[in-house]
A protein has these predicted regions:
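Low-complexity, serine/threonine/proline-enriched polar segments
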Residues: 133-150, 527, 540-550, 699-743
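Flexible, glycine/charged-enriched surface loops at secondary-structure junctions
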Residues: 226-230, 285, 318-322, 504-510, ...
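Non-transmembrane, aqueous-exposed alpha-helical and coiled segments at domain scale
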Residues: 496, 525, 626-644, 667-675, ...
Length: 977
């Protein structure tokens, strides 16, 4: 009886607590709470809400389809904090209820109802595409071209509670976001002081953490969220279907909690802030210290994040250990007042409506404030001053930015290259890290997990776009090492490649440039999806800064431009650039009215000259190889000789080089019957065979598979081996080798694998042709491995890959007797092809280009052979005359001389426009244009005509006896007619 009485008493007490809990909620919770909560949920909420003051933390119940939370609001318990719980969960909707202040304590009860997005069967469409179209027409005059296909991809299970009108209105945002890469936000007043925010974002742009970040931004802007709905509105197509992306539509109902938070100007800024969340980092130091603690806006925080990344890219060449990115960001966040003044100065200078403060005065005050920093720790203060002064210099060197653009996918900055002087003043080591020439222009790009540079050395310039995406390793302790190394080298890699490209471009009217982006692979999506999303985002941002109208002004009126010039940029394909992306970029530039239209990028499959298909780069390298063999007194048609390669059969340059080396003579034999390819080093595998790697097996893989698909059973020579970059769970790597005439297999340790992999290019051969691999693979610190005991492992190197060998290593190897044909000479034919492709696009319509494509390719290949052989003959002739001058130096001298003439003539022709004749232009073009399209030269922009004349005349001057410059030009023009 006593037990029963005790239980009855417990039940009575608990029932009383539930009644008290209900009575209190009835008193303090908004009426909407009781309308929206089910009896089942209320039964779960009441016990959690009872005596809440005596409970710590968050009371939570999680069910398969929902989550319920009850807590007293505090700094550590609030909707922003709880939203982080959902980073790995699929949430369909969230309703947040806040009570009135409690009597006595003033505390606020928060009750959250979270509905999970539980997988279920597909629903039949609630409305037909015809019904949706008819409803859409009620509100909007113009139908999006993709409305029907977008309506047909609606995820009906996620929108079943929406009526036809709301579906139609949301489709206006969804249709635009689906084919572009920015997010769109609309803010509407729905009565009183309540607002509805509708945000459409491509799922590929953000997944985990987006909801939490949105709540955090809204709180920082002075609002609280009362309820939210998160819907997967449309399903997406394949990863390469860039115009049919899955789109999520999130809706938030908010009310201001800070006076003036909903002022018109602040609501405009809020819209821009929310749009930026799709590509902003989450939960980092700047978010905590600047956005949350110091109430910076998201746009300002992103500006400062970009600044920290840029400063790190430069200070890496001052002292890499002292100025790591975390240290730079820590030093910056320690002085929020300085950062706010810098952000305010930047925002004033680039505000579309004009400045609101004196930029020069503001910067001077910031510099004085930095100079007066004194924490009592002199060594630390010195570093802080370097970092903050570098951030200040970055702000001062910005000439244009898409910061105020409403529809952006990344931050883009056009910079004054004078920023390099700032770092040279800090340390001499900075200047020594780069070639002596300084760029004409620099662009910098930044977004979540992506940063990059585009550097050019002349007004009109072209060069490839490569994306560096270090592959994460399994070891947690080492997973970020390769990325951090690439991050520290990003600016130098781009600079050196652009400088090399400038020397390489001596045969064409464009100077040299390079675009290099660094992607941090997260694994959140598959690699191609992450890669393509990053490339699209950077391209969209880049296009905003170079897309000028006929009036010479940027088409985006939100961008203030201090360059006083209309930049024209040309891009070419490079590492990690796919045909799908090339086509998309060309189409996008054409849609937005870019000066060159689809000519912004070369290498398009349908309207271009695909480098990989025609092997144009390798074709040029091959011409230099033939001349090198001649110098070595090797007749490839009869003599035995050996070659080693870096790069694999699937790649452009290496694959096509293998194709040329293994070309047959028409009778079943090889044109080079005595050739042995003794070593090939590719990312997935490396092979060494002293008897020569099986040529037919190697040819089988060309452009169809990577080197790891080579059949190890084809290894022949004693000591031959093949190692695979396929580690198991114990970091051991597969190896096949020939020993005692038998093929043996084993697993080797990582250290042994790396030693063999790195040393594979050091096996003896007559000629080494690097056709792939990372820049600076052979450098001042390791060139001795290539030449053990001072004996080089090859007689010559023909550089098919850019910057594979550092300048210091080149000189050291040449002193040991290695003949090196520099990259800027050897692999220039790819960019020559791209230049002709762009000119063809200007002169011809698409159907005309297609009609003459086969004949045009033949004429361009003839031109490539002429350009390569002419320079090769000049180099070897000069090399034999001037033995004391390394061939790489001769290559630089030739490029510098031609480029110097190009610049002089480009300027001189302003005063002598009569020298820019049609005859000179036609002399530079393939003969087909004079024969069939002689009336098209007016399509070439005047500045391009002048540049074409400058390069054609420069080449003819350099390769003939020199008179006075003007006399030489007049004689050449006269001879051309």
């Amino acid at each position: 009886m006593k037990a029963d009485e005790s239980l009855e008493q417990i039940f009575k007490v608990q029932a009383g607590k539930l009644e008290e809990s209900y009575a209190r909620l009835k008193q303090v919770m908004p009426s909407y709470f009781f309308k929206s909560v089910s009896t089942e949920d209320l039964a779960a909420i009441l016990p959690m809400a009872a005596e809440l003051e005596n409970k710590s933390g968050i009371q939570m119940i999680e069910r398969p389809d929902r989550i319920l939370m009850v807590y007293l609001k505090s700094e550590t318990c609030n909707p922003v904090c709880t939203s982080r719980f959902f980073a790995g969960k699929r949430i369909l909707r969230s309703i947040i209820h806040e009570s009135a202040p409690l009597d006595g304590s003033g505390g606020i009860i928060v009750i959250e109802q979270i509905t999970k997005d539980v997988p279920g069967p597909e629903m039949k469409p609630l409305f037909s595409s015809g019904q949706i179209e008819a409803e859409y027409r009620k509100f909007y005059e113009r139908l999006p071209e993709n409305l029907k296909e977008t309506a047909e991809s609606i995820c009906w299970r996620d929108v079943e509670d929406l009526d036809l009108e709301r579906i139609a209105k949301r489709l206006r945002l969804v249709c635009e976001v689906r084919k572009r890469d920015y997010s769109l936000t609309e803010i509407e007043n729905v009565g009183g002081n309540e607002y509805r925010i509708t945000m459409a974002v491509a799922v590929v742009a953000r997944s985990e953490g987006y909801y939490a970040q949105t709540l955090e931004q809204l709180e920082a802007s002075g609002f609280k969220v009362t309820r939210s709905y998160l819907r997967n509105f449309t399903a997406g197509g394949a990863p390469d279907d860039f115009r049919r992306k899955a789109v999520r539509v999130n809706t938030y109902y908010i009310v201001p909690v800070k006076p003036g938070a909903d002022a018109p100007e602040k609501m405009i800024n809020l819209k821009r802030e929310l749009n930026e969340l799709a590509w902003s980092p989450q939960f980092d130091l700047f978010e905590r210290e600047l956005l949350v603690r110091n109430e910076f806006c998201c746009a300002s925080v992103n500006l400062l994040r970009a600044a920290s990344e840029f400063v790190h890219s430069q200070l890496s060449f001052v002292d890499r250990n002292a100025y790591s990115l975390p240290e730079i960001q820590r030093f910056m966040a320690t002085y929020p007042a300085v950062l706010r003044r810098l952000a305010d100065a930047f925002e004033s200078k680039f505000h579309p409506d004009g400045p609101s403060l004196d930029f020069g005065k503001a910067i001077q005050e910031v510099r004085e404030e930095i100079a007066n920093i004194n924490s009592g720790m002199a060594e630390k203060d010195a570093k802080v001053k370097v970092v903050l002064s570098s951030v200040t210099d970055f702000i001062c060197c910005i000439l244009k930015s898409n910061y105020y653009s409403e529809k952006k996918t990344a931050l883009a900055f056009g910079l004054d290259p004078a920023f390099m002087r700032h770092y040279e003043s800090i340390s001499e080591s900075y200047g020594k890290a780069f070639p002596p020439e300084r760029p004409y222009g620099v662009f910098f790009f930044w977004r979540r997990n992506v940063s990059g540079f585009q550097i050019r050395f002349s007004e009109i310039a072209r060069g490839g776009w490569r994306t560096v995406a270090p592959k994460p390793v399994k070891s947690l302790l080492e997973s970020g090492d390769s990325f951090e190394q690439a991050r520290s080298e990003l600016f130098r890699e781009c600079f050196v490649l652009a400088n090399t490209q400038h020397k390489k471009n001596k045969d064409i009217y464009e100077g040299g440039s390079k675009l290099v982006t660094l992607l941090k692979v997260t694994g959140e999506f598959d690699f191609k999806t992450e890669l393509w999303a990053a490339q699209r985002a950077v391209f969209e941002a880049f296009l905003q800064l170079v897309n000028y109208g006929a009036d010479g002004k940027l088409r985006d009126g939100k961008i203030v431009d201090f360059t006083n010039r209309a930049d024209i940029i040309e891009i070419g394909p490079d590492e990690n650039m796919s045909d799908e992306m090339i086509s998309w970029m060309g189409d996008r530039a054409g849609e937005d009215g870019y000066t060159l239209g689809s000519g912004v990028i070369s290498g398009k499959v349908d309207t271009g000259i695909n480098h990989k298909h025609y092997g144009v780069t390798s074709f040029g390298v091959f011409q230099y190889l033939l001349r090198t063999l001649q110098y070595l007194k090797i007749n490839p048609a009869h003599d035995d000789f050996s070659i080693k390669l870096s790069g694999g059969p699937y790649g452009d340059v290496a694959g096509n080089m293998i194709k040329l080396l293994n070309a047959e003579d028409g009778t079943g034999g090889y044109r080079m019957p005595g050739l042995r390819i003794v070593a090939v080093t590719d990312g997935p595998a490396a092979i060494f065979d002293p008897a020569g790697i099986d040529r037919r097996e190697l040819s089988r893989l060309v452009h169809s598979a990577n080197l790891d698909s080579f059949d190890p059973a084809k290894l022949r020579g004693e000591g031959a081996f093949m190692i695979f970059n396929q580690p198991d769970g114990d970091s051991r790597y597969p190896m096949a080798s020939v020993s005692g005439g038998k093929l043996r297999r084993a697993m080797i340790a990582r250290d042994d694998f790396m030693r063999m992999f790195q040393a594979n290019i050091c096996h003896e051969a007559d000629v080494f042709i690097p056709c792939g691999g990372r820049p600076q693979t052979i450098n001042a610190g390791n060139y001795g491995l290539y030449a053990p005991d001072g004996k080089p492992s090859s007689k010559a190197i023909v550089e098919g890959a850019n910057s594979f060998i550092t300048p210091e290593a080149r000189l050291a190897l040449q002193k040991l007797g290695v003949v090196i044909v520099k990259d800027s000479s050897a692999n220039k034919c790819g960019v020559i092809t791209s230049s002709y492709e762009i000119l063809s696009g200007l002169l011809l319509d698409k159907n005309e280009f297609s009609a003459i494509h086969p004949k045009l390719v033949v004429e361009i290949m003839d031109r490539l052979a002429f350009c390569a052989r002419r320079e090769a003959e000049w180099l070897f002739h000069e090399f034999e005359l001037r033995r004391s001058v390394p061939m790489t130096e001769l290559s630089d001298q030739l490029a510098d001389r031609i480029n110097e003439y190009k610049q002089q003539l480009f300027t001189m022709l302003d005063s002598h426009p009569e020298l820019v004749t049609d005859g000179v232009i036609f002399a530079h073009l393939p003969p087909l244009f004079r024969k069939k399209f002689a009336d098209r030269l007016h399509r070439i922009p005047p500045v391009y005509r002048k540049a074409i004349a400058a390069v054609e005349l420069s080449l003819r001057i350099v390769f003939r006896k020199k008179l006075s410059l003007e006399e030489d030009v007049r004689q050449i023009v006269s001879s051309i007619g």
